[in-house]
Regions:
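Conserved small/polar residues in nucleotide/adenosyl-binding loops
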Residues: 289-291
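Membrane-interface transmembrane helices that cradle and orient dolichyl/undecaprenyl
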Residues: 104-108, 145-164, 174
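Transmembrane-helix motifs of polytopic, lipid-linked glycan transferases
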Residues: 74-105, 146
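Membrane-interface alpha helices of multi-pass inner-membrane proteins
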Residues: 118-119, 163-179, 190, 221, ...
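Transmembrane signal-anchor helices characteristic of membrane glycosylation enzymes that use polyprenol
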Residues: 1-18, 121-125, 219-233
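Short acidic/glycine- and proline-prone juxtamembrane loop motifs at membrane-interface regions
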Residues: 126-139
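Membrane-lumen/periplasm interface segments of specific transmembrane helices
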Residues: 182, 192-194, 198-199, 211-249, ...
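Membrane-proximal lumenal/periplasmic loop motifs of glycosylation machinery
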Residues: 10-22, 35-59, 73, 80, ...
């Protein structure tokens, strides 16, 4: 249904795409041009932009290139490609997360739980607004869902190398998709780490604490060190002038903006779900994860 909507919306009109669409479209064209000059030029340019540019082609553009190369290479076809490719990854990762949650919490009506949750994801206005305008950085939502799916119920009490490697890999891809997703990474691992360490200390599981520490150290070496120039540039940059136009008025004003984008219905549904989940002891953990 979503694919049909995007296909009708973008093929049946002529649009002028601005902001992120133009940025990523230019990155896509330059990516091809750089690799046309040689493999080393393409790889070097991609690494340089990843380290020192706010928008990097390493995840989104490399993912889109195997499909983009067979199109007329216009901004409209790039937007259409993103609107058809990215939702499939977001919906698939959401389905995987819901599958994990079903196994973990065993709801009384698992089919209804999955159907309503997927419907909520499919109908989320911000998802459609971003892709309707040809903004591909929504891809990070798929990686965020995968992080949640990998973290649910895992407390480092057992060695699972594949899970830990996947956690580190999806963390890196999420940060590279868009710089602002770093806030998601920090919040996720802060809460996740506190939860895992608290459980380990409470149960006096020394090996669990050591396993968590080794994972944190290995992740910093494998993900943090290669991206250190990017972190250093972000730490030195002053984004106040750039984002002052979009984010004004503080936290309450930002909530008001989200209400306008999401609409009253979605806002009320989310509020009711959160309050009921916090009230119901059996659903409290699930509600905290969604928050």
């Amino acid at each position: 249904a979503s694919a049909a909507f995007y296909l009708h919306a973008m093929v049946g009109r002529q649009s002028l795409y601005l902001w992120d669409n133009a940025t990523y479209y230019n990155l896509q064209v330059r990516l091809e041009s750089n690799f046309a000059d040689g493999v080393f030029t393409g790889v070097g340019s991609t690494i340089y932009k990843t380290w020192f540019n706010d928008y990097a082609p390493l995840v989104i553009n490399l993912l889109a290139e195997p499909f983009f190369m067979f199109t007329p290479r216009t901004a409209n076809t790039f937007a259409l490609l993103c609107a058809l490719l990215i939702p499939s990854l977001v919906y698939y990762s959401a389905w995987l997360l819901l599958t994990v949650l079903r196994r973990k919490f065993q709801p009384k009506a698992p089919v209804l739980f999955t159907a309503l949750s997927m419907a909520f994801v499919l109908l989320l206005p911000l998802l459609h607004i971003a892709l309707y305008r040809g903004m591909p950085d929504l891809l990070g939502v798929a990686f965020a869902f995968m992080l949640l799916a990998l973290g649910v119920g895992y407390d480092f009490s057992q060695p699972t190398p594949a899970r830990l490697v996947s956690l580190a890999a999806f963390t890196g891809m999420l940060m590279l998709t868009r710089r602002s997703y770093m806030f998601t990474v920090v919040a996720f691992f802060l809460l996740y780490g506190v939860w895992a360490l608290a459980r380990a200390v409470r149960a006096r599981q020394v090996q669990t604490v050591l396993r968590f520490g080794r994972f944190a150290a290995a992740s910093l070496v494998c993900v943090g060190v290669p991206l250190l120039p990017m972190f250093w540039r972000i730490a030195k940059a002053d984004y106040s002038d750039r984002y002052a136009t979009y984010q004004t008025g503080g936290f309450l004003a930002e909530l008001a903006n989200q209400r306008v984008y999401l609409g009253w219905l979605v806002f009320v549904i989310m509020l009711i779900g959160i309050l009921y989940g916090l009230y119901n002891a059996k659903a409290r953990a699930l509600s905290l994860i969604h928050i």
